[in-house]
Amino acid sequence: MADIKTAVAKTKNARISPFKVRQVLALIRGKSAERAQVILKFSDKRAAGIILKVLNSAMANAEHKYGMDMDKLYVHEAFADQGPVMKRFRPVSMGRAHPYVHKLTHITVKLCERQQEAK
C-alpha cells in the first residue's frame, strides 16, 4: 500500500455546515472520479458545487503533479472536518439578542488509481 500515489485537494473555511457537506460526500465516496463529477453536477444540494471544485482540483493535481491516468481515478477518501465558528447575534423583541453561529468546514478529497487485479 505504500507505493500507491494519492492526489489530494483541500478547501478550508467553506461557509457551509459540516453536516450538510458530509451528506453529499457520502454520495461520491468510492466512486470513479468521472462518475463523482456527474453526481455532483446534477445534485441540487448547495454543498455539491463546493465539493465539485475540490474534486476538479484533485483531478488536476493527479494529472499534473503525479501523471496519473485520469480514467483510473476514483475517490479514495472524502471527508469534512469542523472548522471555526463565527458567533453572531440576531436582534429579537424587547431589545434583546439571540446568539447563533455560522459553521465553517474543511473539505478534503483524496483520489487514487484503481489497481488492476491479477487473475
Regions found by a protein language model. Name each.
Residues 86-96:
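Short, low-complexity, polybasic intrinsically disordered segments
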Residues 34, 87, 99:
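Short, electropositive, low-hydrophobicity segments enriched in small/polar residues
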Residues 95-103:
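C-terminal structural segments of small proteins and small subunits
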